[in-house]
Amino acid sequence: MSYRRELEKYRDLDEDEILGALTEEELRTLENELDELDPDNALLPAGLRQKDQTTKAPTGPFKREELLDHLEKQAKEFKDREDLVPYTGEKRGKIWVPKQKPMDPVLESVTLEPELEEALANASDAELCDIAAILGMHTLMSNQQYYQALGSSSIVNKEGLNSVIKPTQYKPVPDEEPNPTDVEETLERIKNNDPELEEVNLNNIRNIPIPTLKAYAESLKENSYVKKFSIVGTRSNDPVAFALAEMLKVNKVLKTLNVESNFISGAGILCLVEALPHNTSLVELKIDNQSQPLGNKVEMEIVNMLEKNTTLLKFGYHFTQQGPRLRASNAMMNNNDLVRKRRLADLTGPIIPKCRSGV
């Protein structure tokens, strides 16, 4: 309580009156005391990190050379402090000597005929390069030895030094022939419901317009004979996928659909998969290798639709996560098992299949 009473004495003081009563020297002292400087601020120069602690006038400009001379003279005049323990120069420990590597016994056992050893011992660099060129051992020569030997006239076999080593001859692989399918003619045959046309292959035909691909999807709605339809690498996009999804809801004949290596996004793929419950004839669907990844959310929705489908036997897509991959594999395995049981039922009698969980 006494401390609070002491503080109340200074609550009603007039600061302007107190400052007006101070002298010029007292104001200068107060200014120095209130000068806020940070000594730990590394961004400020050393002279600005603290207050000016002297009022003396400078004796002259700063000269670095004179300061260094003064410090050197002062260091020579004052004797160094003696060591508490004098240095005796005694060496302790053992001198490190590297171990000699053992010689290769194979190299030690190599012996040549006396005449050959004498010839190699007295051979010049040009003669050694000549031997290396004849034997084809170009790694025995350094670059300096190579150019010196090449410039000398005493070397015999200069062709061996400059000889070109022939690479391995590979069999030329011809480019894949372009797809011979006539786009317009095939479209007309689908519209006319040609019974001889059961497979449509438009793979790698990159100049097919998007309206033409959508016209194919519209024509397949009424076609009764086409069982395989493939448009791999045709630059198909989401509008084509939406048209194919509408076709799957109506078509009851198509068994294989391949739309790999295109520009279909996750929305187009989901639309295709969501059309599977309305289709009972499709047994194989391939959607892998699109221009952009589908994402975890789209993969989970695809798996949920696959688990509800009982007719699809092959699904061509590489899932990025292990969970959806295993669930899709189990769904395809169960569908193939149902086909096997139906086939056995036709031969031996009715077999009641096990109910799939979550369906």
UniProtKB/Swiss-Prot annotation:
Which is an annotated GO molecular function term of this record? tropomyosin binding
Q: Does the keyword Cytoplasm apply?
A: yes
Superkingdom of origin organism? Eukaryota
Which is one Pfam family of this protein?
Answer: Tropomodulin
Write down the InterPro entries for this protein, in alphabetical order. Answer: LRR_dom_sf, TMOD
- Give the UniProt record's GO annotations in the biological process aspect: actin filament organization; adult locomotory behavior; lens fiber cell development; muscle contraction; myofibril assembly; pointed-end actin filament capping
One GO CC term, this protein? membrane
Keyword Cytoplasm among record annotations: yes
Residues of the region (Disordered) are 36-61
Where in or outside the cell is it found? Answer: Cytoplasm, Cytoskeleton
Region: Tropomyosin-binding; residue ranges are: 39-138
Q: What is its main location?
A: cytoplasm
What keywords would UniProt list here?
Actin-binding, Cytoplasm, Cytoskeleton
Q: How does it assemble?
A: Binds to the N-terminus of tropomyosin and to actin. Interacts with FLII.
Q: Which family does it belong to?
A: Belongs to the tropomodulin family.
Query: What the protein does?
Result: Blocks the elongation and depolymerization of the actin filaments at the pointed end. The Tmod/TM complex contributes to the formation of the short actin protofilament, which in turn defines the geometry of the membrane skeleton.
Entry protein name: Tropomodulin-1
Taxonomy of origin reads: Eukaryota, Metazoa, Chordata, Craniata, Vertebrata
